[in-house]
Every structure is written in C-alpha cells, then in structure tokens.
Amino acid sequence: MAYTEMVSVAGLSYKSAKTWVLVEPEPEEPQICVQLFGTKPEQFAFAVNAVQERVGDKLTLIDINMACPARKVITKGEGSALMKEPELAASLVEACVREARVPVTVKIRRGFAAGENTAAEFAARMEQAGAAVVAVHGRTASQLYTGEADWSTIDEVAARVGVPVIGSGDVFSAEDAARMLTETAADAVFIARGTYGNPWVFGDARALALDGVPVPERSALERIEALREHLTLLHETQPFMARGRAFSSWYLKGLPHAAAWRGRVVQCTTYEEFMALLDEAEAELAVGPDADGR
C-alpha cells in the first residue's frame, strides 16, 4: 500500500491548495493511506472528514506521523516531538478515531532523546486511545537516521500491545524486509529509503518473504529505463531539478562508469537534457562489453 507524503492538518484546515494536492490518489492506485501530522485535535478531526470526502473509497487508512525527526517539524511540537507528550498524542488519535470510517494508525520511534526507550509504553497508550496499528522505527528522534536501528524495539512494542505492529528502520532491500519478518515480531514492514533507485523492492520483498523467490538482478538497461519513467513522472507532477538529480544518482549507482555519469547529471539543467543523457547512456550500454550491465 502506498502512503502519501506527510500532510499537514493545519494546511488542510486552511484549505491550502498545495496541501490538498498531496492527498490526491493517482488513477491507477486502488488504495492509499493518508499520513497526517500536526498538534491540534480539532484540526485532525477536520482533516479526517475532509480527506474521507475527497479520497472516497480509495482511502484505506489514516496514519498519524509521530516519528518524523526533522527539525522543522519537531520545533513545532509535531512528528516525533509528540513522543514527549503522550497525552496530547492520545488526544489526536481519539479525535481521528471519532471521525474516521477507516482504521487509524500511528508511526512512532524508540524514543525522543538519545538513550530513551519509551516506545512500548507510548504504543500502549496509543492503542488505548484507539490506534488500530502501531508502526515503530528502532531509532530515537535525536539519532535521526544515524547509527543502527534497534530492531528489539519492535519486539518490545509487540509484547505490550494487542494490535498489529509494523517494523521500520534499516530495511534497504528485499532481503532486509524478509529478515525483519523472520527475526522480529513485526506483522509487516515499512520500506522507505530502501526504495531509492530500487522501485522493484516492494514486489521483490513480497515474493521473497511469502514464496521464497530469490531477488532477481536488474540489468543496467533496466535501471536506466526505470529512471527514465521515474523522471518523466516527476517532471509531470513536482518541481524537477533537485529531485531529478538525486533520483538519477540513486539509479546510476553501481552501473558501469557510474561516477562519470553522475558528474554529467549534475550539469543537466532541464528535463530534456536528462532524457538526452539517458539516451546516450542506453546507447553506450547497448554496444559496450557490459551491455547487460551485470
């Protein structure tokens, strides 16, 4: 299932057009989860009703993000800062549950400050408030994404609550996802940074975890073609250049002469230049000794 980007309940309440764009499902998406953040129960209640009306039957879950460690979020008391305010966090869950026609879920971290481990207690309070699922990331907010995620946090939360638990943190591949399901009490797995340059990871993880299907290796040409499609979609929907360069670097990693190609990506200033560069890369790969890119 696809999650939206983090959507500000304040933005929805103020009827910001830029915010509303974030909740619109693509025509080919059968279902989505809308991920909300904020601090005011009344704004969450408004947002849930408004999203339900806007998204309709495609809405499967409402998620409250209590895990984001970004400074611009936590300085407003939002995201992972809510882990310091469990009663306020519970009131947000309750406000959503009262209005929602779909399950309400929460995403949390191991704790807020370095060395804290409050996830299990916090998760139990969110379940009491009505959360139907708890997702937990094995780092504290102060760690951001440094160090290693402590997967034992998943087991601690699962032992404390009776609702499904989703594991998160350091899932960079299909193999990581399968290992988390095997080694922890997680009922499901979030894949976030593991998607960078690897849009196949979701299907690969499902096939590996459920059916034991080995992860296939993608050729350089397959990766170039996927990058082309990704850049085209990005060009059609969002500000392009900064993200286009980042996405290109992820896909090109590990390809023949990757450093040289990444250097040329930085010089691209338009979508058309990106496409021309990919044409050149495909032509070189097709005739070179590493044509299959393996």
Language-model features, listed with the residues they occupy:
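Short glycine-/acidic-enriched loop or helix-start segments at secondary-structure transitions
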Residues: 13, 46, 73, 176-177, ...
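Alpha/beta enzyme core
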Residues: 45-78, 85-163
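Pocket-edge positions in alpha/beta enzyme catalytic cores
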Residues: 36, 80-81, 146, 215, ...
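Glycine-rich, positively charged N-terminal anion/phosphate-binding segment
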Residues: 1-57
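Alpha/beta catalytic cores of nucleotide-metabolism and tRNA/nucleoside-modifying enzymes
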Residues: 99, 115-133, 152, 156-167, ...
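Hydrophobic faces of well-ordered beta-strands that scaffold small-molecule active sites
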Residues: 2-5, 32-36, 62-64, 104-108, ...
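Active-site beta-loop-alpha junctions enriched in small/polar residues
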Residues: 7-9, 37-39, 67-69, 109-113, ...
